[in-house]
C-alpha cells in the first residue's frame, strides 16, 4: 500500500532540465495525471497503513547517522569553534559558557526524527485529512522524479506556504510513498505547544526563532546545523523560501537567509550538487480563511497553543474541498549556476571559516529564489472558485448567477491560454460546477434569487459606520485571498494593459517604460525575477497577442477590435493594488508628519482609509490590508522615497514627500523621461 509500484513506469529524475533560469515555458512535457491519495485510505485500514513496512531509498552518498551524532558534529565543528573564538574576543566571555549556550541553542532548535512518531502522525493525519478534504491530488511523476533525486544528491524541498497544513501534508505524502521523511524548518511558536510541539520535533521539525537579529552565536549554530544536514545528506531538508505563511494567499518575495545556508556546501565544494524541488500546494478552500482576513485588518494573530488547536477541532465538521500538491522537476544547482559563477574563488578560503558571499553570488542566490517562487506559481492548480473570485471582486454589488457563469467560462478560456492549470470537473455540467463551488464557499458568498453576493459577518446590536466598513472589508479580503491565488496568471498581461492606458503614447518604448515603472513599484507586491523586465514585458505582450487582444509592431502597440473588454478586465485586476498605493501616497504627502514610527503609521493610515471609505472617496476595501501597506513602505524604501532607522528598538521612517509625490504622479499620469528609474531595474 502506498508503494511506488503503481508509478514504476513513469519517467525518472534524469529528465530534469539542464536549466530553467530563463523561465522558458515550464514543464512542457509534464504529465497531467494526478492521483488522489485519500481514495486508497477510504478503502483500507488506516492502522495498517501506518504500521506497514517503511523502507525509503536513502541518498547514496550518505552514511546513516543518529540525531545525537548529527548534533555532536555541529558542536564539534571547526566553524562553530572559530565563531566562538571571535565572540570570546569581542565580548570577553569564557569559552565554556559559550559552548554551553551553543549546546542549549542546539537542543532548542534540533529535530529528533523517529519513525514511531511518523507512524503515529501518519495514522492521525489519515483520519483528519479524510474529514477535511474530499481529495488530495498528487502528481505521481513528480514523486518519481523526487525518488530518483533523493538517491543522487542532497535534496531541498521548497513548498509555497499558505496554511498550517502545508508541512503536515508533505510529510504524509512522503510517508505514503516510501520516500525519506524530510527535516522541516518550523517557527519557534510551534515548539511551545504542549505535547504537539514534541510530536512535531520527533516528526522531523527543527525550530527557528523569527527575531534572530544580530545574535552571532545563534546564527552560527543554526547555519552550521543546516549545512551539516545538507553536507551529510542526513535527510531531505524542507523550508519555505517565502519565509512566512502568506496571509494574502499570493506569493511573497523570498527571504534569502535559509537559501544561503543550504547552498553554502555547494559553493564550498563540500557537495558536488544539490537538487532544489519547487512544490506547489493549492487549496480549494483554506482552513484559516477568516483568520487571515482579520489578521490583515489588524486583529492580533492568536498564539499557537495546544488548547487553541483543540478548540479549532470544529473545522473537522466542515468541507474544504480538494487539495492539489504538485512536485516540480528537481533542479540541479550546478546546472543552474553553470557559467554564471566562478566557484574557484571560494576554494581560496578554508571551508571551516565563515564565508561571505560577494555581491555577484548574492544576486544569483536571489535570482534563484525568485525563480523557485515563479515555478511554484506556474505549477499551481487553479480552482473554479479562484476564477469566480476574480469576477466577484469586480462586481461587489452582486452579479446574476447566469452572468457569473458566463464570465467564469470566458475567464477559464483566457486563463488556459495564459498557461494556467485549471481544475474543472469533467463529469459535471457547467451549472453544477458553479453551484458546487458556491456551496463549498458558503462562508464567503451566498446566492439569493439567482444573484450572488459576498457574505458579511452579522453581530448583535446596532452597527457603527466603522463596524460596517470593517465587516465589509473582512468579506472582501476573504474573497480577495482566493483571487490572489490566481493573480500571477494575469500579472504581466495586466501590467501591459495598465501601461498602455498610462503611457504618453502607443509607442512600444513608452509602454515599456511605464511597464518597468510598475514592475519596480510592485516588486514587493508581486514576484518578478530581478533583471528580467524585458522578458516579463515580452511575456505579457505575447500572451495578449496570442489571445488576439493587441496588435504589436516594433514601433507601437494597439488594442485590436474586440480586445477592449479583455484590456479593461485585466486593468481591473490590478486596480485594488493601484488604488491602495495611491491612497498611501496621498496620506504620506498630505497627512503624515516628516518622521513617524511604524506603529503610528499603521494606526494613522487605517483611520485615514476608514474615513475615505465611509465618505465614498475611495472604493477599494483592500486598502485596509496591513500587508499591502507594509509592501508600499518597502517599495518606497527601495525607491529612496523613505529612509528607515532604528530608534529605541522601533523602526522610524523619514519621508521625502517630494519623491513620494513624483512616484504618485507617475502612477496616476504615466512614466515621463524626466523621472527615469532604469538604473534600478
Give the label of every model feature segment.
Residues 1-681:
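Membrane-interfacial terminal anchoring regions of lipid-handling membrane enzymes
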